[in-house]
Structure formats: structure tokens, C-alpha cells
């Protein structure tokens, strides 16, 4: 809808930058908020921003008053909401499933996100056709309400546990040691805090390298790849190329969960990344549509596997008092560096 109104490639590029830059700059700060305050409330704040953005889009579409600066502001707020949500969400997953089942929890979270990638365009397209862009995006805002309401009293999170302990043992949450939230110096301090932990540093750098040098850049170039493979836009073949990676990731989530495969080990993560690089290279070089489809499917399979593995290894080894900051540092690397994907 935005592209049809403005026909601006620059705005389309800004939408990508506005989505990833907040992860790069503010993930550690978002993690610090999750360390200091209740992660449930931090997630709710992020969802509130998403709801506000969706309602604003709906109003502007309905009133036909959308201007370029409106789009820029809303895209920035949307990116900030995602950066605010991510570290707190991973902290809450850790608290819900515990350390032993953490990889499973992270993997299922990634699988549900992949399912959203597969089904989201279909549902969004259906709403667009059924009720139009304005009411479609307003209905989208309502999707956040059930999770927001559940989080209000959800019996999970450090704040909930410490409240229970305070009731039973005469302690209060305020007595727990927390570090003050600083500016950008927090990023460097967090890096110093974990500098001696080889697993955290290596997994953070590995995830960052994947995002920086490849990331999702090949998705943006898919029209050119598809043209070389004889699959023009708006055809089944083009759609198959776009969704092959997500289908592979969904298969990974299901198969690895059923079989309890791929225990979190740093060496395994490195091997998977190397294999993933080979598959992406094969996709870029092949002239066969069917081989390209196979390469993308298995690349998606491995991507979900090594992403969940690196995330798990970092969370398991993060000190309790700064777990949010460490998760934020990892998120800044793994998601924030996608700003420069394919450099």
C-alpha cells in the first residue's frame, strides 16, 4: 500500500533500515530494561507500540491523509518496538522452559515466527481483499490483545518469582542486585563482562558474521535470481522460491523437536553455518530451478537450527544479573547487522 502510494524506492530502502537499525543500536538497552524491570511489562510496552503503529496506519489509510513523513515516523517506531520486545521475550522463554529445555523453547519460538512468515502474507492479503487496507491493519492491531492480556498475570519471569520469595521469606524485589542503565557505554561494558567467555563471544561473532556478509540479502535479490531461473514474478515458481527457505525452517522446527536432535554445541553451530554457506553459494550459482529450490529449503532448515543453537548457547552461559544485556548484545549482532546484509 505504501509503495503504491509513493512509488519511492528510497522509502522502501528506508523501511528495511528502520527495521534493523534499532536492533543494532538499542538491543543492549532493551536487555538492560528487561534486567531491571519485569520482562512481561517490557514486552507489553513493545506490543503497545506495535498497536499504536497499526492503528495510526489504519487511520491514515482510512482518511487518505498519509504523507511521506508519517510513513517514516511510523516505520521508525515499528523498528523500536521490535528491538524493545526481543531481549525481554527471550528472557521470558528462558524462564518458562528452564535451562534444560531452552533450545527447544528458542526453536519453537523461531518456528512460530517462520509459520507467521508463511501464513502472514496469505492472511494479510485476505484481510486486504475482504475489508481493505485501513480496516485490515486495524484488525491486525487486535491480534496483540490476547497475548498482552495473558502477560498481565502470567506466572513467569524473575519479577514474579522474586515476588513469591518476598512473600515467603520477607524479601522484596528491590533488594535484588541490579546495575544502573547507562547510555551506549552499556554496550562496551557488557562486552567486557563476557569477554572471557569464549562460547558467548564466538557465538555472538558467528551470528553477526552471518547477518553481515549474507543475512537475508539474497531475498531482496530474488526477482533477479528468479528471472535467471526462468521464474517470473506472480507465478507459482516465483512464490516457491520465496517460500522455500521458510518451509525448510518450519520443517526443521518440527523434525528437530520430534526427534530431539542437534544438542547445543559451539562446534556443531560452526559446522551448520559452513554448510549453510555452501547451500547459499550453490543457490546463487545453479542454473536449475529445482536445484535452487532444494538449496533454499535445506538452507532454511540449517538457518533455523544454527540460529536457535547459537541463541541457546549464549543464554545458558549469560550471568543471571546481566542476562538481558547479554541477550541484547547477541541480538544486536544477529539482527542489527542485517542492516548491512550482503556487504
Spans of features found by a protein language model:
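Helix-loop boundary and gating motifs at the non-cytosolic
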Residues: 1-24, 192-245
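Hydrophobic alpha-helical segments of secondary membrane carriers
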Residues: 108-116, 206, 329-334
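Conserved extracellular-gate-facing transmembrane-helix segments in secondary transporters
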Residues: 86, 117, 121, 210-219, ...
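MFS-fold secondary transporters
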Residues: 3, 56-61, 78, 150-151, ...
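Small-residue-rich segments within alpha-helical transmembrane domains of MFS-like 12-TM solute carriers
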Residues: 79-87, 215, 300-308
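Juxtamembrane intracellular "pre-TM" segments in multi-pass secondary transporters
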Residues: 156-205
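Hydrophobic alpha-helical transmembrane segments
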Residues: 68-75, 79, 104-162, 243-248, ...
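C-terminal transmembrane bundle of multi-pass solute transporters/carriers
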Residues: 24-29, 36, 40-42, 49, ...
Amino acid at each position: 500500500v505504501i509503495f503504491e502510494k509513493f512509488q519511492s524506492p528510497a522509502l522502501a530502502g528506508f523501511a528495511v533500515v528502520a527495521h534493523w537499525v534499532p536492533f543494532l543500536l538499542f538491543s543492549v538497552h532493551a536487555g538492560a530494561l528487561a534486567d531491571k524491570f519485569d520482562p512481561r511489562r517490557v514486552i507489553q510496552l513493545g506490543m503497545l507500540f506495535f498497536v499504536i503503529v497499526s492503528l495510526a496506519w489504519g487511520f491514515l489509510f482510512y482518511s487518505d491523509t498519509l504523507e511521506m513523513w508519517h510513513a517514516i515516523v511510523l516505520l521508525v517506531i515499528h523498528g523500536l518496538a521490535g528491538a524493545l520486545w526481543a531481549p525481554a521475550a527471550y528472557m521470558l522463554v528462558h524462564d518458562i522452559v528452564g535451562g534444560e529445555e531452552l533450545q527447544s523453547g528458542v526453536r519453537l519460538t523461531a518456528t512460530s515466527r517462520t509459520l507467521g512468515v508463511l501464513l502472514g502474507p496469505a492472511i494479510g492479503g485476505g484481510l486486504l481483499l475482504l475489508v481493505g487496507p485501513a480496516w485490515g491493519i486495524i484488525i491486525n492491531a487486535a491480534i496483540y490483545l490476547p497475548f498482552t492480556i495473558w502477560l498481565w498475570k502470567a506466572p513467569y519471569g524473575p519479577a514474579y518469582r522474586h515476588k513469591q520469595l518476598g512473600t515467603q521469606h520477607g524479601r522484596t524485589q528491590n533488594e535484588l542486585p541490579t546495575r544502573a542503565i547507562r547510555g551506549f557505554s552499556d554496550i562496551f561494558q557488557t562486552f567486557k563482562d563476557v569477554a572471557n567467555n569464549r562460547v558467548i563471544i564466538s557465538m555472538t561473532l558467528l551470528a553477526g558474521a552471518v547477518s553481515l556478509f549474507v543475512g537475508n540479502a539474497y531475498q531482496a535479490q530474488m526477482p533477479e535470481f528468479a528471472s535467471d531461473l526462468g521464474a517470473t514474478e506472480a507465478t507459482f515458481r516465483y512464490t516457491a522460491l520465496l517460500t522455500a527457505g521458510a518451509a525448510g525452517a518450519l520443517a526443521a522446527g518440527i523434525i528437530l523437536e520430534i526427534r530431539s536432535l542437534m544438542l547445543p554445541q559451539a562446534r556443531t553451530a560452526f559446522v551448520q553455518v559452513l554448510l549453510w554457506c555452501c547451500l547459499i553459494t550453490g543457490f546463487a550459482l545453479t542454473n536449475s530451478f529445482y536445484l535452487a529450490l532444494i538449496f533454499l529449503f535445506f538452507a532454511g532448515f540449517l538457518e533455523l537450527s544454527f540460529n536457535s543453537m547459537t541463541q541457546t548457547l549464549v543464554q545458558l552461559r549469560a550471568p543471571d544479573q546481566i542476562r538481558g544485556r547479554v541477550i541484547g548484545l547477541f541480538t544486536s549482532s544477529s539482527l542489527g547487522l542485517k542492516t548491512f546484509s550482503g556487504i
